[in-house]
Curated annotation (Swiss-Prot):
EC number, UniProt record: 2.4.1.15
Regulation: induction: Low induction by sucrose after 24 hours. Down-regulated by dark incubation.
Protein name, UniProt field: Alpha,alpha-trehalose-phosphate synthase [UDP-forming] 1
Keyword Ion transport: no
NCBIfam families, sorted: PRK14501.1, trehalose_OtsA
Xref: PANTHER family: ALPHA,ALPHA-TREHALOSE-PHOSPHATE SYNTHASE [UDP-FORMING] 1, TREHALOSE-6-PHOSPHATE SYNTHASE
CDD domains: GT20_TPS (cd03788), HAD_TPP (cd01627)
Length: 942
């Protein structure tokens, strides 16, 4: 949207995320203040308050109608207000996508529909929010198979700013009643998956999941049809977990947020779901993922870490450089609506009647859906125990329980209804009299006015949810208690406990004794303590409104997109394959340096299971690379080096049949496939630290399940990739602390930390440090007479080894003379004491780029010659990796440059890593395969 503050480019972007969010908050407050000064504000007009206050009656429908239909008036008013500000402001379009529209449709004729507004929690959250121009997308709740009916309904809904998604009966049955209500909802509330003993039922799960994905795609199709550039798409709840992925596949630049209104279970619960990985990855496609509480957000990040093996950060979840922000956004209510309602004559009359009806008795209140997670039986049993232990209260207290029926056709809910009725009847029969009973139970909902009156006269509200995303009944009770200042007893398993816990009495609803004791505490609480508790909760409810919740979420979503754009600007672009191939074909002498692990390795088919340890530890060349590698190796103008941290035996097994150079253990060992292994660094490295480090690695391997360590000639590696992620990190931290203060405190070693590994290697053993010497061996072996004018370096290298990318990096502009590295002559390159040839020298301006550690290592070795051990003595007898003839005498003086490399002919590319020194990126080994196939085709073509 042109001119939109969220889309325009600004010459100044605040440095920090917090600064940007604070500035946006100030602008919102300023606009609210301007609107408050205008008496014609449609949404904020107080003269209509009496007609706007009913949850389930005509007044509620009028209130929401006013919100949905008053867009034009609101926008006109906004324009008038914003003209008073420094600059104009255009409201951002917000596409709210939920399973159900905030209307119920009834067909009156072939092309006639009657629409009834149903003010649910989500609608209430957005009532009065004038920051956005909202459109609602969802299912209308009816099956409309004919085209005439669909067009008529779409036209009628358009007047309400609603857009329908048409789902047939079979989809609704499988997707909504099946997968959403029978699988996801119970799982997210810790009720577990259905326990079935028939294969047919298992097959029905598969069909339900397929319907779930299909329905989400249908929602995405409607969103895509109405999407305009700059819109924010806000997806809601567990019904639409696949929607973010579907939307991003359509338009990767779309701003997508997803919010869950239920709890998110612990990773141990979520991992029981057969489709666990698909759902998590689909949600991670969103830019911002929101939950009611930090606990739910933490569980989600933990599930992504433990199930998908991704990196969890304080900001969210990171996958190959892309960050999905995960945060808590506690929802609220429209508190002013409840406060104003207490002044309505109808509510005042209700309050008077209730006070007269229950005069002389303390009133306790429970308002719940008749649902398994609401803990109604536990609440009533706790009340029974209280009456049993406190005979003096039996005729002084009454419990009013409002149980709104839901899913009355489901056997489990019918059983719950019977159970509640049985308990209530037993208690009333035991403690009741001819004139009064201790429990008044209603199986129906109350209108808004009656509910507000009931809240206002209540002394103690009792919320005993076994699991609840938030539970706004507690908020509504607090909002109506400004005069009475009653006490809130709140389940610690309700999301509201995180927000109202300081002022409420928190209880474990499963502990009947504790709840009964809390009832006594609440009824006997002093007025002073009640006032303090209420003041805290009332302030929270007043300030953390539903409108503020919606504005905060969308504001953070917009800023998350800005943050992502800033992050992406620092990420190298994707490898320009066409350009790389063209320059390859035009060059005369090419050098290809390829990593192995996570670059040329085969994919592991683990059917969505993370960490198939046995298969992944056995590194194998990607089967589709055999042909391309042979074609590239057969080209006399192309030299290929596989540069890997793997051992010599692994490289021999995978590349023995190819005509290429193999550099094992980060370039420490080198050989042409038809030759013998040689060392590229001095043999006498200080390796006295090996035994003590190995002892430490063994200790932590024994105490970290599924971890292992590898012993190589120049390094030791402890790997915890397959261990529990969090436990592995703790163990790695302790291991490093022990190493630094003990075995390697004075040793000449480098410690390299991978994402799931710790490596200790001899000082100076890096891929970049070895390249200079490898290059000299290659030039000497091939008797090159033409300088190398094209270099391609591709790999998934750890940060310590990324100096291989910068080794060839020209520092002059591409239009200036090429960088030249001279081949040293025999008289200028003095030999070391062991007879090793020193590395070719670099141009002066490259002296600090790589190889500096090698120099320090050589000096260290010369100074500590008495403590050195030959690497050859470390090899096991019978090894095929003999170092015989590992060194050749220096060649005769060569009068030409080894490298004649210009900037445009150098392509460094990181695989699966976005934080890199490389110029370009490739996403995965499969992308490497695709590129090398194209390169091989160029080599094969005449």
């Amino acid at each position: 949207m042109p001119g939109n503050k969220y889309n325009c480019s600004s010459s100044h972007i605040p440095l920090s995320r917090t600064e940007r969010l604070l500035r946006d908050r100030e602008l919102r407050e300023k606009r609210k203040s301007n609107r408050a000064r205008n008496p014609n504000d449609v949404a904020g007009s107080s003269e209509n308050s009496e007609n706007d206050l009913r949850l389930e009656g005509d007044s509620s429908r009028q209130y929401v109608e006013q919100y949905l239909e008053g867009a034009a008036a609101a926008m006109a008013h906004d324009d008038a207000c914003e003209r008073q500000e420094v600059r104009p402001y255009n409201r951002q379009r917000l596409l709210v996508v939920a399973n159900r529209l905030p209307v119920s449709a009834v067909r009156r004729g072939e092309d006639s529909w009657s629409l009834e507004i149903s003010a649910g929690g989500l609608v209430s959250a957005l009532l009065g929010v004038k920051e956005f121009e909202a459109r609602w997308i969802g299912w209308a709740g009816v099956n409309v198979p004919d085209e005439v009916g669909q067009k008529a309904l779409s036209k009628a809904l358009a007047e309400k700013r609603c857009i329908p998604v048409f789902l047939d009966e079979e989809i609704v049955h499988q997707y909504y009643n099946g997968y959403c209500n029978n699988i996801l909802w119970p799982l997210f509330h810790y009720l577990g998956l259905p326990q079935e003993d028939r294969l047919a039922t298992t097959r029905s799960f598969q069909s339900q999941f397929a319907a779930y994905k299909k329905a989400n795609q249908m929602f995405a199709d409607v969103v895509n049809e109405h999407y305009e550039e700059g819109d924010v798409v806000w997806c809601h709840d567990y019904h639409l977990m696949f929607l973010p992925k579907c939307l991003k596949e359509y338009n990767s630049k779309m701003k997508v947020g997803w919010f869950l209104h239920t709890p998110f279970p612990s990773s141990e619960i979520h991992r029981t779901l057969p489709s666990r990985s698909e759902l998590l990855r689909s949600v991670l496609a969103a830019d911002l993922v929101g939950f009611h509480t930090y606990d739910y957000a933490r569980h989600f990040v933990s599930a992504c870490t433990r199930i998908l093996g991704l990196e969890g950060t304080p900001e969210g979840v990171e996958d190959q450089g892309r960050l999905t922000r995960v945060a808590a956004f506690p929802i609220g209510i429209d508190s002013d609506r409840f406060i104003r309602a207490l002044e309505v004559p109808e509510v005042i009359q209700h309050m008077k009647e209730l006070k007269e009806r229950f005069a002389g008795r303390k009133v306790m209140l429970g308002v719940d859906r008749l649902d398994m997670i609401k803990g109604i039986p536990q609440k009533i049993l706790a009340f029974e125990k209280f009456l049993e232990e406190n005979a003096n209260w039996r005729d002084k207290v009454v419990l009013l329980q409002i149980a709104v029926p839901t899913r009355t056709d489901v056997p489990e809910y019918q059983k719950l209804t019977s159970q509640v009725h049985e308990i209530v009847g037993r208690i009333n029969g035991r403690f009741g009299t001819l004139t009064a009973v201790p429990i008044h139970h209603l199986d129906r909902s109350l209108d808004f006015h009656a509910l507000c009156a009931l809240y206002a006269v209540t002394d103690v509200a009792l919320v005993t949810s076994l699991r609840d995303g938030m539970n706004l009944v507690s908020y509504e009770f607090v909002a109506c208690q400004e005069a009475k200042k009653g006490v809130l007893i709140l389940s610690e398993f309700a999301g509201a406990a995180q927000s109202l816990g300081a002022g409420a009495i928190l209880v474990n609803p499963w502990n009947i004794t504790e709840v009964a004791a809390s009832i006594g505490q609440a009824l006997n609480m002093t007025a002073e303590e009640r006032e303090k508790r209420h003041r805290h909760n009332f302030h929270h409810v007043k300030t953390h409104t539903a409108q503020e919740w919606a504005e905060t979420f969308v504001s953070e979503l917009n800023d998350t997109v800005i943050e992502a754009q800033l992050r992406i600007s620092k990420v190298p672009p994707e490898l320009p394959q066409h350009d790389a191939i063209q320059r390859y074909s035009k060059s005369n002498n090419r050098l290809l340096i390829l990593g192995f692990n996570a670059t040329l390795t085969e994919p592991v088919d683990n059917q969505g299971r993370r960490g198939d340890q046995i298969k992944e530890m056995d590194l194998n060349l990607h089967p589709e690379l055999k042909g391309p590698l042979k074609a590239l190796c057969s080209d006399p103008s192309t030299t290929i080096v596989v540069l890997s941290g793997s051992s010599r035996s692994v490289l021999d097994k995978n590349f023995g049949e190819y005509d290429m150079w193999l550099a094992a253990e980060n370039g420490m060992f080198l050989r042409l496939t038809n030759g013998e292994w040689m060392t590229t660094m001095p043999e006498h490295l200080n390796m006295e630290w090996v035994d003590s480090v190995k002892h430490v690695f063994k200790y932590f391997t024994e105490r970290t399940p599924r971890s292992h360590f590898e012993t190589r000639d120049t390094s030791l590696i402890w790997n915890y990739k397959y261990a529990d992620i969090e436990f592995g990190r703790l163990q790695a931290r302790d291991l490093l602390q022990h190493l630094w203060t003990g075995p390697i405190s004075n040793a000449s070693v480098d410690v390299v930390q991978g994402s799931r590994s710790v490596e200790v290697r001899a000082v100076g053993v890096t891929k970049g440090a070895a390249i200079d010497r490898i290059l000299g061996e290659i030039v000497h072996s091939k008797s090159m007479t033409t300088p190398i004018d094209y270099v391609l370096c591709i790999g998934h290298f750890l940060g310590k080894d990324e100096d291989v990318y910068t080794f060839f990096e020209p520092e002059l502009p591409s239009d200036m003379p090429a960088i030249a590295r001279s081949r040293p002559s025999s008289d200028s390159g003095a030999k070391s004491s062991s007879g090793d040839r020193r590395p070719p020298s670099k141009s002066t301006h490259n002296n600090n780029k790589s190889g500096s550690k090698s120099s320090s290592s050589s000096n260290s070795n010369n100074n500590n010659k008495s403590s050195q051990r030959s690497l050859q003595s470390e090899r096991k007898s019978g090894s095929n990796h003999s170092l015989g003839n590992s060194r050749r005498p220096s060649p005769e003086k060569i009068s030409w440059n080894v490298l004649d490399l210009k900037g445009e002919n150098y392509f460094s590319c990181a695989v699966g890593r976005t934080r890199t020194n490389a110029r370009y990126l490739l996403g995965s080994p499969d992308d490497v395969v695709c590129f090398l196939e194209k390169l091989a085709d160029t080599t094969s073509s005449p």
